[in-house]
């Protein structure tokens, strides 16, 4: 039985969501006694990390969009049963850096795959599990890509090599999801100073936990 809460973190490339999450968690631990788990997709467990390597390898430019989607779904399922569900059943607060919405935005809006097919696969992989809250960090594609190019410590992956048009479609996909699920998905302006973005994210998380 699930007694914990699931919060997902989403955003186009360069939105800074991972950095925000790194700063958010220590602040949250000062305010709540609940055990907190942070993890990521694709990855989080050994099998899913191996799948991540396949997906992001810059040499795999021939990867078909449906192959890409199915790899993400496989990684999601293994991660869920091995790590996420046990934590939720133990009453933990779980943060996932990317989850079901990424598939709809990237493989749906970005790659042009049928949204209904992606939603069915998400349902199949998660047994219908949905986040209690999704923090969507929004940033224009031009700014996001400029941040990526300016970050010399970041390892370039296959998705970073995509055209700006695909990144723009991904962002539109996210914005459409936010309109479709206004109670679950909170849109946060990620062009603001980092401290302000973290503060807004913290407010939304505390509102969920203290409701």
Swiss-Prot record:
Keywords: ATP-binding, Kinase, Nucleotide biosynthesis, Nucleotide-binding, Transferase
Database matches in Pfam families: Thymidylate_kin (PF02223)
Catalyzed reactions: dTMP + ATP = dTDP + ADP
GO cellular component terms, semicolon-separated: cytosol
Residue positions binding ATP: 11-18
Single Gene Ontology BP annotation: dTDP biosynthetic process
MF term (GO), any: dTMP kinase activity
Known EC number: 2.7.4.9
NCBIfam families: DTMP_kinase
Function statement: Phosphorylation of dTMP to form dTDP in both de novo and salvage pathways of dTTP synthesis.
Designated name of the protein: Thymidylate kinase
Gene source species: Streptococcus pyogenes serotype M1
Gene responsible for this protein: tmk
